[in-house]
Amino acid sequence: MVATSLDGYIAGPNGEADWIIMDQEIDFDGFFAQFDTFLLGRRTFEPMARAKNAGMPGVRTFVVSQTLEQRDHPNVTILGEGWEKTVSALREEEGKDIWLFGGGMLFRSLLDIGLVDTVEVGIMPVLIGDGIPLLPPPAIRAELQLTSHRVYKSGIVGLEYAVKHTPPKKGLQPTKARRRSSPKKSTRLRR
């Protein structure tokens, strides 16, 4: 799930995440087992690449960037111009879901073109006052339907929403809300 402060930020003003609670109740192994494809924005990917922590065995990783070069990052696939059609095609493949792992700008772009099916948010019991918002401006309106929730002992509130879709932008595959057991992929915002 994407960690957010109660006031709607996914990171502090300088990208800091020291306020995020690593709750032992959350089953991270089970969480990662739901995905066979990761989708990241450049700003989320770059610190991972510097730490040599970009990608997981058996999981395809795609990075949306207009500036990164494929030759510099052989363990991931860089998606430049036309990335939207590639993501749309990935969603039509059989397999597990796609994990949209940051950031806010990529989330906003995918939401705007109808390529996000589920939003899973972990609201941390903290107000940070400023930072990188979950949905950066210019934000769009998106109707959501609550599908599950959980309150953890740490005070984290986990919320899962299905996105009520409008028709996608011209040239992209229609998006359907899919169950996890569906053979086709679902794009899920989780972090």
Range-by-range predicted roles:
Residues 1-191:
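Enzymes that bind and transform nitrogen-containing heteroaromatic metabolites
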